[in-house]
């Protein structure tokens, strides 16, 4: 979680005092740099592995550790340096740098507008149908519900940040409608989590689900009722919640341990195992 907090801070800090660089623009720039780095690293790793395998098979034997070390260098050294080289330098607020940061490649634009957004819309319909058909009874304590709702909130948040710079009617509809749908979904998830806590206590996994529910609720409100240039407000909130989850006395494992101990004590007392 500390590394995750540092990564979010890495995206957020350059946008704090720069009105021309909102959070969603830098998020898009970092996303493009990350995807490009992953693609380049995979291609390079595949090429190096193929060359070493060919040498081992056709010419002379090569220790398998050579391949592992080569992949290690590509994955950690090359990928890190290449990723940092793609991160925009906003120190001088060069217009060309700002333009490149906010530019959405045609491939990514088509992928988001004509593939990702329709898929999210269909997934929303399926999720709503599942809730409408099965609501009531054991529905609220179903193990399947929490992962579905959490994954939906993550997808909507990421897609929203990526499509903010795209001028298209589908993108604009997504920005207007889906944050409000996400707010309703998060409320469902919060109710489901609270009901499961009453039966099973707090586990470390459910602790993170609750924290994510808090974050998603605030995020949905910001996306729904604030301008998209205010999207950076979600970054410090996410960082604070992430740090809380690893802080002494209130971290996930401490809270879940105390909760499970209390559940066991209550169960033992009800069965007269403890006097």
Give the label of every model feature segment.
Residues 1, 57-71, 130-148, 193-208:
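Membrane-helix interface and helix-disruption motif detector
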Residues 1-110:
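Membrane-interface helix-loop-helix junctions at boundaries between adjacent transmembrane segments
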Residues 2-11, 78-80, 146-160, 182-188, ...:
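Generic alpha-helical transmembrane segments
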Residues 25, 29-42, 108-116, 142-148, ...:
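Membrane-interfacial loop-to-transmembrane alpha-helix junctions, especially the N-terminal start
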Residues 46-53, 123-128, 184-197, 247-258:
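Hydrophobic alpha-helical transmembrane segments in multi-pass integral membrane proteins
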Residues 154, 174-226:
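Membrane-embedded alpha-helical segments of integral membrane proteins
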Residues 229-252:
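Internal/C-terminal transmembrane anchor helices
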Residues 247-275:
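Membrane-interface segments at or immediately adjacent to transmembrane helices
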């Amino acid at each position: 979680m500390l590394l995750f907090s540092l990564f979010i801070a890495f995206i957020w800090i350059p946008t704090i005092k720069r009105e021309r660089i909102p959070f969603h623009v830098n998020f898009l720039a970092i996303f493009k740099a990350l995807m490009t780095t992953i693609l380049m690293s995979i291609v390079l790793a595949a090429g190096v592995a193929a060359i070493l395998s060919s040498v081992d098979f056709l010419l002379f034997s090569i220790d398998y550790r050579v391949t592992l070390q080569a992949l290690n260098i590509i994955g950690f050294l090359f990928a890190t340096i290449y990723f940092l080289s793609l991160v925009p330098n906003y120190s001088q607020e060069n217009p060309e740098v700002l333009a490149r940061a906010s530019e959405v490649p045609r491939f990514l634009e088509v992928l988001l507008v004509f593939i990702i957004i329709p898929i999210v819309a269909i997934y929303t319909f399926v999720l709503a149908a599942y809730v409408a058909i099965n609501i009531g009874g054991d529905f609220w304590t179903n193990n399947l519900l929490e992962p579905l709702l959490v994954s939906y909130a993550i997808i909507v948040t990421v897609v929203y940040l990526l499509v903010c710079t795209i001028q298209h009617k589908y993108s604009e509809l997504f920005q207007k409608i889906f944050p409000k749908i996400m707010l309703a979904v998060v409320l469902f998830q919060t109710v489901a989590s609270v009901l499961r806590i009453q039966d099973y206590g707090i586990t470390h996994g459910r602790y993170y689900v609750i924290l994510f529910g808090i974050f998603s609720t605030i995020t949905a409100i910001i996306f729904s009722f604030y301008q998209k240039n205010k999207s950076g407000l979600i970054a410090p909130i996410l960082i604070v919640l992430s740090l809380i989850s690893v802080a002494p006395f209130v971290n996930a494992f401490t809270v879940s341990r105390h909760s499970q101990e209390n559940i066991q004590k209550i169960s033992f007392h009800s069965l007269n195992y403890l006097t």
